[in-house]
Design a protein with these regions (language model features):
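Acidic/His-rich segments in extracytoplasmic proteins that coordinate ligands and/or metal ions
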Residues: 40-114
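Glycine-rich, highly charged phosphate/nucleotide-binding loops
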Residues: 32-50, 251-265
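A charged, amphipathic alpha-helical module
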Residues: 102, 106, 110-233, 252
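C-terminal hydrophobic structural anchor segments
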Residues: 254, 259-301, 305
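Gly/Ser/Thr-rich loops at beta-strand to alpha-helix junctions
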Residues: 11, 63-69, 199-206, 281-288
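Redox- and metal-dependent alpha/beta enzyme cores, enriched for Fe-S-associated oxidoreductases
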Residues: 1-26, 197-268
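Metallocofactor- and cofactor-centric catalytic cores in central/energy metabolism, strongly enriched
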Residues: 5, 16-19, 26-30, 34-42, ...
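Peripheral docking tails and interdomain loops at the edges
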Residues: 291-342
Length: 342
């Protein structure tokens, strides 16, 4: 349709990288938004309220994953007098839910055609879904190799992966990314480092996290549930139902058991030594579920750490504390690994 998609999290992460996020956070406080709200959404709202954020042509949002969506987008829709499209994803993971969402996606196509005054062909929709299917297959293949291959990587690579499976899903770029990723993993040797399963988003900007994982040969992020879910395989033949299936079966929709099952599956697939669950400030769903996820995974034999922090606002987290906790967790995993092999 000729539109460039961007997200709250992506833009706020970029703004935080420029070190000027506090200006926008203060602006949202002045407007009465609670400090307990997700920092990504608060930075985004602040940027909009100060006028630095250009008015978009339209807004598309869902009730998936983040409850901040239901506050941010209706507010900005009114503020900008901007057309918006809301996709309601039912809690129940049934075929009727898939058909319900598929019908909304068909309406979304017409909505975008009206906004852009450009026709979106059914062939273009089919091609996008075909690309997504191929990308999911490549991603699944590289996950299966992670037990015996340890590519040296960085948090930036993980950030790219999130873009590819969400903002650029269905694109030729996303497909190319997974092809190259698969080749990189195939060519990477087996290392001696720890395999870590990361759950939820990553604090890409936090120095101790970068020091622990960037180009490290001692600790590797072998899988991330947020990314793996984004590259979910789709079974339905109809392209709209395939996309709807991906949304309905998202691990952030429905019971917390979905997230636990995904984590257990990824840990087994990649032979993870431990798991890190990032409890991002203001993410009520993850913070509320973190204790249940940790207990379930540890009962299944996967040592798990809940890492409290903020991926966007450094004022809400301590580098020293994060560094100490990561080091202690790594030492524990190393000890467990030595005992396992002795």
């Amino acid at each position: 349709a000729g539109l460039t998609p961007y997200s709250v999290e992506a833009l706020s992460c970029f703004i935080a990288g420029t070190k000027c996020e506090q200006i926008f956070l203060r602006k949202t406080e002045e407007e009465g938004f609670p400090e307990t709200m997700c920092s990504y959404h608060r930075v985004f709202l602040g940027a909009a309220l100060t006028g630095i954020l250009p008015a978009p042509k339209c807004m598309i949002y869902t009730n998936l994953a983040c409850d901040g969506n239901m506050m941010t987008f209706p507010y900005l829709k009114e503020k900008y007098s901007c057309p918006g499209f809301y996709i309601d994803v039912p809690y129940e993971k049934t075929q009727s839910s898939i058909k319900y969402v598929a019908n909304q996606l068909k309406e979304l196509k017409h909505f975008l055609e009206d906004i852009t005054e450009k026709k979106i062909t059914e062939e273009a929709v089919e091609n996008a879904v075909t690309n997504s299917r191929k990308a999911a297959a490549h991603f699944k293949s590289q996950l299966a190799l992670r037990k015996d291959h340890d590519p040296v990587t960085s948090l930036t690579n993980e950030l790219y992966a999130i873009f590819m499976c969400h903002l650029l899903a269905g694109s030729e770029t996303s497909l190319k990314y997974t092809e190259l990723l698969l080749e990189d993993v195939k060519n990477a040797p087996k290392g001696e480092g720890l395999h870590v399963l990361w759950m939820h988003i990553m604090p890409f900007l936090q120095q101790p996290v970068k020091e622990a994982f960037n180009y490290s040969k001692t600790m590797h992020i072998s899988a991330c549930d947020f990314v793996a879910d984004g590259f979910r395989e789709m079974q339905a033949d109809d392209p709209y139902e395939a996309m709807a299936e991906k949304m309905v079966h998202c691990i952030y929709n429905g019971s917390v058991s979905e997230r636990i099952q995904m984590a257990e599956k990824l840990a087994k697939l990649t032979d993870a030594d431990g798991g890190i669950l990032f409890a991002h400030w203001g993410c009520k769903g993850t913070i509320g579920a973190s204790g249940l996820i940790k207990k379930a995974l540890e009962d299944a034999g996967l040592p798990t750490m809940i890492l409290d922090g903020d991926g966007c606002n450094p004022a809400n987290t301590s580098d020293g504390q994060v560094s100490t906790r990561l080091q202690a967790f790594a030492e524990m995993l190393e000890k467990n690994k030595e005992e396992k092999h002795s």
